[in-house]
């Protein structure tokens, strides 16, 4: 009697082991669960991002470079390869010593809007005028003689191509609130 019970238990264990063996052959091992990444902090302006070096880009706080942020904000933008850096400002990505090539599609959307004379600060004035226009994605200040004497140009093409030049400053509007 005990022998029959022992054989039954051994057969039961063998059947269970066979089930595990067969299921292991036919059902490949699942990938381990990915580690849960911390949620990205949502933002509307740079002041919402408390971490050092973080800026609000596309509604999330990130430490991506200014040029990468532009490419993220404005899809299909074509930047001149000579442009290697830019700066974040509260409403614009600002380049030093750059302008649009007048022959590019971006340059063809250049609108001559205002000629400035002292005592206005040219760049600040151009920036305010661009922010007042609904279609303005960028502005340029061509300086004449004094720091504040020059001309404002505005751009409305959504995919600008930037070209280097020594006597102008171009800024592209950021997509922040």
UniProtKB/Swiss-Prot annotation:
Q: Where are the transmembrane segments?
A: 8-24
Please list the residue ranges that the record places on the Intravirion side of the membrane: 1-7
Q: What is this protein called?
A: Putative membrane protein 165
Q: How does it sit in the membrane?
A: Single-pass membrane protein
Q: What is its main location?
A: virion
Q: Which family does it belong to?
A: Belongs to the asfivirus envelope protein p22 family.
Induction annotation: Expressed in the early phase of the viral replicative cycle.
Q: Where in the cell is it found?
A: Virion membrane; Host cell membrane
Q: Which residues lie on this side of the membrane: Virion surface?
A: 25-166
Q: Which organism is it from?
A: African swine fever virus (isolate Pig/Kenya/KEN-50/1950)
Annotated Gene Ontology cellular component terms = host cell plasma membrane; membrane; virion membrane
Alphabetically ordered keywords of this record: Early protein, Host cell membrane, Host membrane, Membrane, Transmembrane, Transmembrane helix, Virion
Report whether Membrane shows up as a keyword of the record: yes
